């Protein structure tokens, strides 16, 4: 069962831009995803030398592979075609490798604990998004 898997604290989940996925999951499945990691947040803390933190950029930098995001906006509402299935599978395969590389950098740069603190805020950010608070409530 997908709900059990996503809410299981003992199983680590890796997303890229977890905030969006978790908002969708909470809204439609009414569950809180547990034990979450986000390669986008990791990238922003680990790769402070760059302003390019999209999955396409990370795949290129860490894996040396050019990926097309053309299918990203295709219709995933019905039966998926071969290209869509491959797109989804590649995202999952790439995320594990990227996660490992980013974690290594965060540990080396002594930013891993900061990342853990940042990711612990994601549940609150999801709740704010669902309550339609899209502005940064911490800004002046």
PLM-predicted stretches and their roles:
Residues 1-105:
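Conserved DEDDh/DEDDy metal-dependent 3′-5′ exonuclease domain
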Residues 82-140:
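Mixed-charge, glycine-rich, non-catalytic linkers/tails in nucleic-acid processing enzymes
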């Amino acid at each position: 069962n997908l709900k059990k898997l996503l809410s299981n604290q003992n199983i680590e989940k890796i997303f890229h831009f977890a905030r969006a996925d978790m908002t969708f999951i909470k809204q439609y499945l009414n569950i809180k995803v547990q034990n979450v990691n986000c390669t986008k947040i990791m990238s922003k803390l680990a790769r402070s030398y760059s302003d390019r933190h999209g999955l396409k950029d990370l795949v290129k930098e860490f894996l040396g592979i050019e990926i097309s995001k053309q299918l990203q906006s295709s219709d995933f509402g019905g039966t998926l075609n071969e290209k869509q299935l491959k797109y989804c599978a590649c995202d999952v395969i790439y995320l594990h490798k990227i996660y490992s590389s980013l974690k290594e950098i965060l540990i080396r740069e002594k930013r891993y604990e900061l990342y853990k603190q940042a990711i612990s805020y994601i549940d609150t950010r999801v709740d704010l998004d669902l309550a339609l608070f899209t502005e940064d409530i911490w800004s002046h």
